[in-house]
C-alpha cells in the first residue's frame, strides 16, 4: 500500500464513519475504483480506532457522566438515574454485534465485500433510512429509554457488519423507528458503537499488518498515520453531522446513497471495475 493510498483511505474513513453512508463500503469502492484493490476488512477495522477515539473525545463529558452514574448506581441502588440505565443499555446493546461479529467474521472479510453486494446494500438500505425519517415520531427522550431500546438498536447495529449498510444509518434508523428524537438516536448509536469498534479494531490489529488474500497490506507507520488522520477528520465530521442531523435529517444522505449505488452498478455492469 502506497502512502497516497493510506492518506486517501484514511480521509475517506474519517469523513464517512459517522455519516449514514457506510465507511466500509466507501473504503471498498474507493480502493477498487482508484487503486484497483481492496483495502481489506482489517485495515478498515484498525483505522476505525481513530474515528472511535474521536467519538471518545467528542463525547468525553457524556461518557464520564454515564460511567460515574453507572458505578455509583452499582454501589447505591437509591441513586440509579437515567445515566445509570443508559450505561446498562450500552452494555446490553453491544452483545448482539459481538456474538454475530465473531460467528460471521470470515464472511465479513470476504463475500460481504463484493461490490455488487455493497452497491445493492447502499440502494436498498436507503429505503429503510427514508422510512425511519418519515415514520419516526421523535417524541421520546433519554429519560424514556428502556432495555428494549438497547436490544433493538444493538441488533440493528449488527447490520453494520455488511459493507454498504452503515452503522450510524442502522442505529439512527432503529432509534427513529422507536420514537427517539434525532439527536438522542444519533448519540445513543455512537455510544453503542464505541465498545464494538474498539474490540473489532484490536482484534484485527495483527491481521492488518499482513492480510492474506483480503487486500492491500499496510506497514506499522502507515497504520499509525492512517489512524491519526481518521481521528482528526472524524472529529470534525461527527461535530458537523450532529448539527446537520438535528436541522435537516438524513434525506440528503438517502439521495447520495442511491446515486452512488447506481454509479457503482453501472461501473460493474460495464466492466470498468471488478466486483472482487
Curated annotation (Swiss-Prot):
GO terms for biological process: cell wall organization; peptidoglycan biosynthetic process; regulation of cell shape; response to antibiotic. It is a multi-pass membrane protein. GO terms for cellular component: plasma membrane. It is found in: Cell membrane. Keywords: Antibiotic resistance, Cell membrane, Cell shape, Cell wall biogenesis/degradation, Hydrolase, Membrane, Peptidoglycan synthesis, Transmembrane, Transmembrane helix. The keyword Cell wall biogenesis/degradation applies. Disulfide bonds: none annotated. The chain crosses the membrane at residues 1-21, 39-59, 84-104, 115-135, 159-179, 190-210, 222-242, 253-273. GO terms for molecular function: undecaprenyl-diphosphatase activity. Its EC number is 3.6.1.27. It catalyses: di-trans,octa-cis-undecaprenyl diphosphate + H2O = di-trans,octa-cis-undecaprenyl phosphate + phosphate + H(+). It is an enzyme of class 3 (hydrolase). Belongs to the UppP family. Catalyzes the dephosphorylation of undecaprenyl diphosphate (UPP). Confers resistance to bacitracin. PANTHER family: UNDECAPRENYL-DIPHOSPHATASE. Bacitracin is thought to be involved in the inhibition of peptidoglycan synthesis by sequestering undecaprenyl diphosphate, thereby reducing the pool of lipid carrier available. This is Undecaprenyl-diphosphatase.
